[in-house]
Amino acid sequence: MAKIIDKGQITLQGGAVMSWNITDDEVLTISGALWNGSVTVGKDIKSEAKFRHLVLDVSVQAIGIFNFSDWDYIEEVTLPSSIKCIEHAAFFGCKNLKRVNLPDGIEIIGADSFCGCESLETIILPDTLKEIYEYAFYETGIAEISVPWKEPIYIGDECFPEDTVVYIPKEAHRA
């Protein structure tokens, strides 16, 4: 069993409290009350600790703008089924990020969300997605991707790397 090596609480604007802990197997877990339904992580965690796996608790519904950008040591992100939105540049520049689960229920992936995550080579897009904004997966290692949608959704300009092969279901409707 993993041992907690660091932990803390952050009081957010409006008085909500969010807790976090880091275990000796390099896992950061964030949980607790969230302001505006969006996790906002203070610079204290970023500057003090190194971890490879980020786990967000089931209470998280959105990840805010630039929350985890340029966290070079993150290799894996586990998102809860409650997540609905990953906002602009949430994981921008996480160059060692290799694995992200996008659970059923997620609806929006903001612009530049995973841009610059050059180690990210595969991603499974759930059919609950309604919007993927510009450059969401640009400058990643994704070479091919299958989209599950039979109905058109919003996909922004250059949301995948330039040479990405996109597979579309045969029964998909034209926009």
Residue ranges and their predicted role:
Residues 158-161, 175:
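Short loop/helix-cap segments at secondary-structure boundaries that form the rim of catalytic
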